[in-house]
From Swiss-Prot:
Annotated keywords: Endoplasmic reticulum, Membrane, Sugar transport, Transmembrane, Transmembrane helix, Transport
Motif (Di-lysine motif): 321-325
Family note: Belongs to the nucleotide-sugar transporter family. SLC35B subfamily.
SUPFAM superfamilies (UniProt xref): Multidrug resistance efflux transporter EmrE
Segments crossing the lipid bilayer: 18-38, 54-74, 88-108, 139-159, 171-191, 213-233, 246-266, 288-308
Protein name: Solute carrier family 35 member B1
Upper classification of the organism: Eukaryota, Metazoa, Chordata, Craniata, Vertebrata
Membrane-topology descriptor: Multi-pass membrane protein
Function recorded in the entry: Probable sugar transporter.
């Protein structure tokens, strides 16, 4: 009887990771479509076509919706938990989180969406490196191997050799530098979140609320100081149809972020970065299956590496030790 009760109590914990993965996958699948539609779409006709260049305003709206959604979650589901995390930690985390998001969105003005996804697929590497160097974490060897396999698999799956000279053909430019900056800041965000999780047992909804509130404050000052707010409002007045996409973009972000912060709190930022990286892979694999697109030999190798990495992580990559603090 006691054993059955123990098994029942562990069932929600076993379901938590699949729920987090499916939540992140579903929300960010649509999020990615909307992001590319907004940032790479052409607005207007003929010679008067315009591009959306308001990365700060887009992320500002995203953070406002995220914060409001987190406040609702706390109000109805998490009102008992007290939050003891220092405000300066939230502020530091929001700065790196913001920088990563703005850099990533800005990169889409210079590189195409697959290039951006491929760059962000390397996210587990800075998260792991900074976890080891700054927080003195010690991961099992299998964890290093599985991260390497997943990142390599995604890279192989998404890589397409250049077919000839074109508008997007370049070696390393401003867009790639922005992606590199975004990856570095992702790693710093992971370090901040790990610190909050280890020292203050910060809840996922409180983390989501406070990081987004600080981000809203910083971005609000930024769009007012640069004058981008007025240019953005003028743009939406000229092309009101974009407002619907931006609001949907914010809602999918808020839902997805609630699953992301839940993953960070229960499983750590490295597991979260593995989930988000794998999600990108499955998004592309789904399009291949649904639309019967052919898969090259290199992509099949990438597919095998991703599943091998996930299998190794599920079986051997659970343990993590701290050597200090």
């Amino acid at each position: 009887m006691g054993a059955n009760a123990g098994r029942r109590s562990r069932s929600p914990e076993r379901l938590r990771l699949p729920v987090c993965f499916l939540g992140v996958f579903a929300c960010y699948f649509y999020y990615g479509i909307l992001q590319e539609s907004i940032t790479r779409g052409k607005y207007g006709d003929g010679a008067r076509q315009e591009k959306f260049t308001f990365a700060l305003s887009l992320v500002f709206i995203q953070c406002v919706i995220n914060a409001a959604f987190a406040k609702l979650l706390i109000r109805f589901f998490d009102s008992v938990r007290a939050d003891r995390t220092h405000s300066w930690l939230y502020a530091a985390c929001s700065l790196s989180y913001l920088g990563a998001m703005v850099s990533s969105n800005s990169a889409l003005q210079f590189v195409n969406y697959p290039t951006q996804v491929l760059g962000k697929s390397c996210k587990p590497i800075p998260v792991m490196l900074l976890g080891v160097t700054v927080l003195r974490k010690k991961y099992p060897l299998a964890k290093y191997l599985c991260v390497l396999l997943i990142v390599t698999g995604v890279a192989l799956f998404m890589y397409k050799p250049k077919k000839g000279a074109g508008g997007d053909d370049h070696i390393f430019g401003y867009g790639e530098l922005l992606l590199l900056l975004s990856l570095t800041l992702d790693g710093l965000t992971g370090v901040s979140q790990d610190h909050m999780r280890a020292h203050y047992q910060t809840g996922s909804n409180h983390m989501m609320l406070n990081v987004n509130l600080w981000s809203t404050l910083f971005l609000g000052a930024g769009i007012l100081f640069t004058g981008e707010l007025w240019e953005f409002l003028s743009f939406t007045e000229r092309y009101p149809s974009i407002i619907y996409n931006i609001l949907l973009f914010g809602l999918t972000s808020a839902l997805g972020q609630s699953f992301i912060f839940m993953t960070v709190v229960y499983f750590g930022p490295l597991t979260c970065s593995i989930i988000t990286t794998t999600r990108k892979f499955f998004t592309i694999l789904a399009s291949v299956i649904l639309f019967a697109n052919p898969i090259s030999t290199m992509q099949w190798v990438g597919t095998v590496l991703v599943f091998l990495g996930l299998g190794l992580d599920a079986k051997f990559g659970k343990g993590v030790k701290k050597t200090s603090h």
